[in-house]
């Protein structure tokens, strides 16, 4: 069966038209052999050589240089380590500490709006309040 297929292909090859290079006709342009790009440029040769070496070693075309892989691996490990530390810091806080932080934040929020209102108040009102405080302090000192 295989030999029959080979015979058929050989017969087809004989039927195909071949250019007649033997006949010399001055009007015809002789075909030139195409240049192999691998042999044509030095950079292409080096690229081809590198690809062959990578193929022999079993490396893919998409693989990165070793230094770049190591740097990415370190960055990834640092990010993972940082995230783990943050999660552990949150877990290690006891409920008492968490409640203290919440109360501290609430107190800070409650203290901030009056300061803002005082900043927007006219100066004569601020001076008047300062005078009242001083007056109350001096009266308390007199009582003592």
Swiss-Prot record:
Coiled-coil regions, chain positions: 66-112
Cellular component, GO annotation: actin cytoskeleton; cytoplasm; focal adhesion; neuron projection; nuclear speck; nucleus; ruffle membrane; stress fiber
Record InterPro entries: FAM107
Pfam families (alphabetical): DUF1151 (PF06625)
Motif position, Nuclear localization signal: 74-84
Tissue-by-tissue expression: Widely expressed. Expressed in neurons. Expressed in malignant glial tumors. Expression is reduced or absent in a number of cancer cell lines.
Signal sequence segment: none
Subunit structure: Interacts with ACTB. Interacts with COMMD1; this interaction stabilizes COMMD1 in the nucleus. Interacts with MAP1A. Interacts with PRDX1. Interacts with F-actin.
Protein family: Belongs to the FAM107 family.
Name this polypeptide is given: Actin-associated protein FAM107A
Native source species: Homo sapiens
Gene name for this UniProt entry: FAM107A
């Amino acid at each position: 069966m295989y030999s029959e297929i080979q015979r058929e292909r050989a017969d087809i090859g004989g039927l195909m038209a071949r250019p007649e290079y033997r006949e010399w006709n001055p009007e015809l342009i002789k075909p030139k052999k195409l240049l192999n790009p691998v042999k044509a440029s030095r950079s292409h040769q080096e690229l081809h050589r590198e690809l062959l070496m990578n193929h022999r070693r079993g490396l893919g075309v998409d693989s990165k240089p070793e230094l770049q892989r190591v740097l990415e691996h370190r960055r990834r490990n640092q990010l993972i380590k940082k995230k783990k530390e943050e999660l552990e810091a949150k877990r290690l806080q006891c409920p008492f500490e968490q409640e203290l932080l919440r109360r501290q934040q609430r107190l800070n929020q409650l203290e901030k709006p009056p300061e803002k209102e005082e900043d927007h108040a006219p100066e004569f009102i601020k001076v008047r309040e300062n005078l009242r405080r001083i007056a109350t302090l001096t009266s308390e000192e007199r009582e003592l």
